[in-house]
Swiss-Prot record:
Record keyword S-adenosyl-L-methionine present: no
Name recorded for this polypeptide: GTPase Der
Quaternary structure, from the entry: Associates with the 50S ribosomal subunit.
A family per Pfam: MMR_HSR1
Origin species: Lactiplantibacillus plantarum (strain ATCC BAA-793 / NCIMB 8826 / WCFS1)
Disulfide bridges in this chain: none
Gene3D superfamilies in the record: 3.30.300.20, P-loop containing nucleotide triphosphate hydrolases (3.40.50.300)
Gene expressing this chain: der
Purpose of the protein: GTPase that plays an essential role in the late steps of ribosome biogenesis.
Ranges where the KH-like domain occurs: 352-436
Length: 436
């Protein structure tokens, strides 16, 4: 089920990023310890009063070399395009400015719910000036202080009241997948090929955002799929469509609402920095991942080309060593018929549960083969392990001292688990806990 999307909009220097960080708190979706991942804090998962939602910081969307008014106009348009609810942020210090009124006009025409936050109300004496902002036409302005974290509860109460009603859940057994990747790698061609004459299209189901259409279809075996955000992939002609941060933001939403992500690379152009950014998000979100090398028909090949390109991918995406790679051509339909089966396999692995007794046999055999590390005469002791979650499979290992579990030994244990059980296509999370 798609989570509601909340966007923070406003002219520069009103404190959008501060408010973003306050609301996101420690739930910002990018973790700090994955090697090789390019980080960008434009998007976070958050929660208020038990309601989960995705948060967009449009302050992080830079339209390079654009005039000031054009920049804030495009920023507002992006928010309108993506959000279910908009937090319109202004500043008490400057009062109502021409730029504020310009953004207000765009938001007013959008018919999206708008909650007006007046930032930088850092002391009670300033509260009387908040009433000036009624002139913007969005009802009660909410006085807040990003610097001190004041007033955010009332603001978020108003935000969640405007969330759309939930639509029906997917039928049991339905697999949700998305195609992610930078612009022009051929995602739309793959969509059209997958939804061709040999597919039964059940319906186009409107998501919680205005134009995020999720497409249901069944494969030749009768298994059900939902392709997430086909509208976003197919959409053309918008000025900001090919700006990197917009496409990353769209990919993040699709990843968040998927079980499996098909990470599409342009085989003719190779790997770019933006590819690494999008792949990093999917990995850190714990989704099942398939690497799809498209436009393979355009690559000059010999008997070693595929193996060499696969080695190139493994070198560039060390943290995706578990992800299967498939070489396709949307133009010629090469290997596209294999994708539904591969998606089903990865989804099965993503949901795999291992019985504790069997898991511990594997762990103890691994330790017998490669003893645990020691430090200053003290040896790491592993008592037992258990699986605590799926999607992704998550294992807790109970030890005498979690600090002694070196990254390399944790990786060794993970590899032994992978050797014993089929977890291809899914990350594995390992958590060390001290035995009480």
């Amino acid at each position: 089920m798609a989570k509601p999307v909340v966007a923070i909009v406003g002219r520069p220097n009103v404190g959008k990023s501060t408010i973003f960080n306050r609301i996101a708190g420690d739930r910002i979706s990018i973790v700090e310890d994955t090697p090789g991942v390019t980080r960008d804090r434009i998007y976070a998962n958050s929660e208020w009063l038990g309601q989960e939602f995705s948060l967009i910081d449009t302050g992080g969307i830079d339209i390079e070399d654009a005039p000031f008014i054009k920049q804030i106009t495009q920023q507002a348009e992006i928010a309108i395009d993506e959000a279910d609810v908009i937090i319109y942020l202004v500043s008490i210090k400057e009062g109502v400015t021409d730029a504020d009124e310009h953004v207000a006009q765009i938001l007013y025409r959008s018919n999206k719910p708008v909650v007006l936050g007046v930032n930088k109300v850092d002391n009670p004496e300033l509260r009387s000036e908040v009433y000036d902002f009624y002139s913007l036409g969005f009802g009660d302005p909410y006085p807040i202080s990003g610097a001190h974290g004041l007033g955010l509860g009332d603001l978020l109460d108003a935000v969640i009241k405007n969330f759309p009603e939930k639509s029906g859940e997917d039928e049991p057994g339905t697999i949700r997948f998305s195609l992610i990747g930078r612009p022009n790698v051929g995602k739309s061609s793959i969509v059209n090929a997958l939804l061709g004459e040999d597919r039964v299209i059940v319906s186009d189901v409107a998501g919680t955002t205005r134009d995020a259409i999720d497409t249901k279809f069944t494969d030749q075996d009768g298994d059900r799929f939902v392709m997430v955000d086909t509208a976003g992939i197919r959409k053309k002609g918008k000025v900001y469509e090919n700006t990197e941060r917009y496409s990353v933001m769209r990919a993040l939403k699709a990843i968040d609402n998927s079980d499996v992500a098909l990470f599409v690379i342009n085989g003719e152009e190779g790997i770019r920095e933006q590819d690494k950014r999008v792949a990093g998000y999917a990995h850190e979100a714990g989704k099942g991942i398939i690497i799809v090398v498209n436009k393979w028909d355009l690559v000059k090949k010999d008997n070693h080309t595929m193996q060499e390109f696969e080695a190139y991918i493994r070198d560039q995406f060390v943290y995706l060593s578990y992800a299967p790679i498939i070489f396709v051509s949307a133009k010629t339909n090469q290997r596209l018929e294999q994708l539904p089966a591969l998606i089903k396999k990865v989804n099965t692995n993503h949901m795999r549960r291992i019985q504790s007794s069997v898991l511990n046999d594997v762990i103890m055999d691994a330790i017998a083969m490669n003893p645990t590390p020691s430090d200053n005469g003290k040896r790491l002791r592993v008592y037992y392990a258990t699986q605590v979650a799926i999607q992704p499979p998550t294992f807790v290992v109970f030890v005498n001292d979690p600090d002694m579990m070196h990254f390399s030994y944790e990786r060794f244990l993970e590899n032994q688990i992978r050797n014993a059980f089929d977890f291809s296509g899914t990350p594995i999370h390992m958590i060390e806990r001290r035995r009480k």
